[in-house]
Amino acid sequence: VHLSRYTTDLTKARHWFVEFEGAGLDGLVSKRLDSAYLPGKRGWLKTKHKRTADAVAIGYRVHKRGHGVGSLLLGLYDPDGRLIPVGGIGSFSDRMRDELETELLPLLQRDADGDPVRIEKPRSRFSSSKDQAALALEPSLVVEVAFDQLEGSRFRHAVQLVRFRPDRQAVSCLLEQVERAPSYDLSQVLTD
């Protein structure tokens, strides 16, 4: 059994917030000294890392309703100039889903017959019954997104749309631009 470190020293907590992120920890949990954990209650506060990055919209999945954007797929250019998938945005209001689809329709990649090009994604243990196919977009739309952490070349969790960036060129959205947490050995975080 391992216990997480704890402190009442704000300076030390701030240091841990930065230092331990590289071990894969999302952030810090704060609570009153006399507060016990109660399942289903929200008496503790979790402070997570938040960053922003500019990414290229590379495709979208149609919402389960059959229209509108279900999720917007994102990519970044690697050092070899390849546009690689890095994650997606899926939290849109119904109105935004429909408006976004209208905006994206002219950007659809089309095959020789004029049909939209589909991006097939292998099914995983989480999505075995869902159609994971997406419609490919011309890599021209840049969006600024908020994220908490990048693991390898993927956003660790779903990201949030901050704004569209018509002032940015898609080719300027590089994987190397994304801030990463310095590596840290998790065994240094846990105590016996």
Give the positions of each predicted feature:
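Catalytic cores of nucleic-acid ligases and guanylyltransferases
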Residues: 1-192
